[in-house]
């Protein structure tokens, strides 16, 4: 699943390509991709004729304000979650639909933003301007603070973890604790912090918690700079792979030597997810 760096990369691409993008026509090929009230028919009816405004990211959600003509007031919201394999593709000219295309959106000049999703778990919503997206999408409402926000700090994390018996890996995957982190960057940040992913959350001391906060934000910043990670399906709008995977410390490196100490990287299921760590560097 695309995590914070990948979704941030997509957001930046959408912000660049869809600046003042007037929605002239929409084709929903797979109705189940639309999760908002009224389904695909209401989605198409409500967004045609509107202009895309500011794109933002909240956790793994993409949020776009929509506007009528040149008016500044918001005429609705377009929200997207890529889930496992969702991706946007940009086409400057009219192009035939490709396999796994779910939604196609054009401007009057024929430029297209296309939503392609192999597993078909991705979701889109149209939200009326009378509501905020958080009022209609439960997942958005439950999100914890962003890793780069002031709210995400060692004191906050210590308070959030002090009664949790679950592993620290499980806690970092919990979107109500920190928004946007996922399997890849939980493994990577725990390696950099020198902490075993199986360690019980409430047993972490202040120094360890501070290391986790620092490591997570550091790893996320590096990955954003590399355009994210492309181990499987992720591409940006132009079809370019993310480059972080080539420098990953542990993720995807089972049985390979640790980049720090040379000991073989281990992999096992933790919190139901394939988890990588160095048995020597992490305690």
UniProtKB/Swiss-Prot annotation:
Cofactor(s) in the UniProt record? Zn(2+)
Residues annotated as binding DNA are 100, 119, 164
Quote the catalytic residue positions.
Answer: 2 (schiff-base intermediate with dna), 3 (proton donor), 60 (proton donor), 273 (proton donor)
Which segments cross the bilayer? none
What's its catalytic activity?
Answer: Hydrolysis of DNA containing ring-opened 7-methylguanine residues, releasing 2,6-diamino-4-hydroxy-5-(N-methyl)formamidopyrimidine; 2'-deoxyribonucleotide-(2'-deoxyribose 5'-phosphate)-2'-deoxyribonucleotide-DNA = a 3'-end 2'-deoxyribonucleotide-(2,3-dehydro-2,3-deoxyribose 5'-phosphate)-DNA + a 5'-end 5'-phospho-2'-deoxyribonucleoside-DNA + H(+)
Per UniProt, the cofactor note for this protein states: Binds 1 zinc ion per subunit.
The disulfides recorded in the entry are: none
Map the zinc fingers (FPG-type) to residue ranges. 249-283
Q: How does it assemble?
A: Monomer.
Kindly provide the name given to this protein in its UniProt entry. Formamidopyrimidine-DNA glycosylase
**Native species:** Prochlorococcus marinus (strain SARG / CCMP1375 / SS120)
Organism lineage: Bacteria, Bacillati, Cyanobacteriota, Cyanophyceae, Synechococcales
């Amino acid at each position: 699943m695309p995590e914070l760096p990948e979704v941030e990369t997509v957001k930046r691409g959408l912000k660049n390509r869809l600046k003042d993008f007037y929605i002239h026509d929409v084709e929903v090929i797979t109705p189940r991709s639309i999760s908002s009230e009224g389904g695909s028919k209401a989605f198409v009816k409500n967004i045609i004729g509107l202009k895309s405004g500011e794109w933002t990211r909240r956790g793994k959600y993409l949020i776009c304000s929509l506007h009528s003509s040149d008016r500044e007031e918001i005429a609705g919201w377009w929200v997207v979650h890529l889930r496992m394999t969702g991706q946007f593709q940009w086409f400057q000219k009219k192009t035939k639909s490709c396999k796994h295309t779910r939604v196609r959106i054009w401007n009057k000049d024929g430029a297209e933003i296309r939503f392609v999703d192999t597993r078909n778990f991705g979701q889109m919503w149209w939200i009326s301007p009378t509501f905020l997206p958080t009022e209609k999408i439960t997942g958005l409402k439950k999100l914890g603070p962003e890793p780069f926000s002031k709210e995400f700090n060692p004191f906050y994390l210590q308070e959030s973890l002090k009664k949790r018996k679950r592993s620290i890996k499980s806690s970092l995957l919990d979107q109500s604790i920190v928004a946007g982190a996922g399997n890849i960057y939980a493994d990577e940040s725990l390696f950099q912090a020198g902490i075993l992913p199986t360690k019980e959350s409430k047993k972490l001391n202040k120094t360890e918690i501070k290391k986790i906060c620092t490591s997570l934000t550091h790893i996320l910043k590096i990955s954003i700079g590399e355009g994210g990670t492309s181990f499987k399906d992720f591409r940006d709008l132009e079809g370019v792979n993310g480059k972080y995977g080539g420098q990953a410390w542990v993720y995807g490196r089972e049985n390979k030597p640790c980049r720090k100490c040379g000991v073989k990287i281990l992999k096992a299921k933790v919190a139901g997810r394939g988890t990588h760590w160095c048995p020597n560097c992490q305690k």
